[in-house]
């Protein structure tokens, strides 16, 4: 088990972020420049730290956040929250209203069971759905960042990304806990299928 409250948790609290995970996004953005003009989609937004950072970097667009759970974000404009399951068509139709997106970020993870085989399989299925959404709603030249659990069939996702993005990288930010089997796949410069 890991220490729930660590240096990144303290830093997030001090800087007003809702979760420590924001530092994963910050590190990746500083290294790879994720943000450009246009709409942004945050999938698996709760508790909201990715959305906080994305909103602060919003350029001429709207931020759309989607999650099964509520988020406690009080942005004054250019923000829409969709509560629901991304596998449902009614949720997809709401997401589609704001497309195309210049950036889709996802720190989403399935509910974990403690069984790595089950957890990586569920992560794979979730990321396949996010990949499908990205293919349907990213603008040409757009970027995608997804969290992936290692140890399953994640290489299939990586190769799918390589088939429609010009640059695809595996990234493990410093803020990822040492005992975690999560990494991020960063896909830049989407070329429509």
Curated annotation (Swiss-Prot):
A single Gene Ontology CC term: cytoplasm
Keyword Methyltransferase appears in the UniProt entry: yes
Positions annotated to bind S-adenosyl-L-methionine: 48, 50, 67, 85, 107
Keyword presence, Plastid: no
Compartment annotation: Cytoplasm
Active site: 147 (proton acceptor)
EC identifiers of the protein: 2.1.1.166
General function of this protein: Specifically methylates the uridine in position 2552 of 23S rRNA at the 2'-O position of the ribose in the fully assembled 50S ribosomal subunit.
Protein name stated in the entry: Ribosomal RNA large subunit methyltransferase E
């Amino acid at each position: 088990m890991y220490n729930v409250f660590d240096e990144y948790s303290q830093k997030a609290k001090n800087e007003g972020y809702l979760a420590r995970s924001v530092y994963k996004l910050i590190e990746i953005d500083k290294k790879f420049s994720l943000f450009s003009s246009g709409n942004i989609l945050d999938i698996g937004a709760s508790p909201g730290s990715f959305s906080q950072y994305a909103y602060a970097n919003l350029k001429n667009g709207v931020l759309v956040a989607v999650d099964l759970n509520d988020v406690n974000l009080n942005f004054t404009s250019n923000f829409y929250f969709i509560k629901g399951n991304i596998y449902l068509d009614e949720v997809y139709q709401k997401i589609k209203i704001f497309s195309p997106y210049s950036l889709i970020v996802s720190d989403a993870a399935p509910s974990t069971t403690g069984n790595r085989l089950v957890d990586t399989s569920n992560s794979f299925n979730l990321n396949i759905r996010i990949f499908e959404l990205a293919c349907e709603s990213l603008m040409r030249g757009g970027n995608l960042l997804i969290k992936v659990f290692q140890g399953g069939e994640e290489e299939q996702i990586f190769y799918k990304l390589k088939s429609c993005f010009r640059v695809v990288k595996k990234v493990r930010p410093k803020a990822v806990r040492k005992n975690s089997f999560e990494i991020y796949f960063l896909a830049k410069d989407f070329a429509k299928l």
